[in-house]
Amino acid sequence: NNGVGVASPGFRCRFLPVKSCLDASTTSIDNGYDGVYYAADHGCDVINCSWGRGGGPSQFEQDVINFAVLDHDAVMVAAAGNTSSEEADYPPAYTNVVSVAATSSNDAKAGFSTYDFSVDVCAPGNQIYATVYNDTYTSYSGTSMASPIAAGGVGLIRSRFPSMNALQAAEQLRITCDNIYNTPTSNSAYRDKLGKGRINLYKAVTDTTSPGVVVENLTTSDYNDNVFIAGDTLRFQALFHNLLRPTTNLTCTLTTSSTNITILPATFNPGAVNSGDTISNFSLPFRAIINAGTPL
């Protein structure tokens, strides 16, 4: 510690800056996915993307992310966006990306931060002191500041648990978050749209017991024409994959806050699930009824 400037959460992690814009660009990321490919191909364990766009998904972009995460074992971390609204931006909303929203110092959602069901975690992003050009420092606000804090946390996790692969390290970051929905802030309006909560790096590097069960390949069907209308009974089937430590008494329950849906009693109790195992509820799918009068 030389007492100058700032320090990264990713203490002693090496970093590789990747240029992803043209010389003439001032605010545009022109070749972001080329940069992701380059970073993965050059052995980066964590790739931070403090950039993104609105609109729909692209299979090409998802393929580049899968190349980085699944083929080259790099954790992809991306800023959720600064729209102050509920929306899915890209790359943060892609599969296999850790989407990071921003919080303020009291754990409330930062006013500028995008929120969405696709968000995975939050990190501080309001008035973050950082380096800038010409050997100076300044404070910035944005999910672009929150994302590298989360990425640095992943660097710590991968240093602490070197046997973890990319998906496991990302899940370790997620499951060790602090719950910020029940704190004395205004986050209740964003329930489940700020991910698991605000990252806690101490827990992330000390928790050696928690499992990490994720839902994969969720499908919804009415066992008819799959045109959902009031009165239909929907069936939800999924795979449940345990990325981390074994469970002893796993219980999966379907819930909703919507008054237009009635959940039928259906709790899936797989019990013990070993690390790396995948199970399904195909034989006992979750069920829910779309109530009469529901606008569709």
What are these regions (language model features)?
Residues 230-245:
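Short beta-strand elements of extracellular/lumenal beta-sandwich folds
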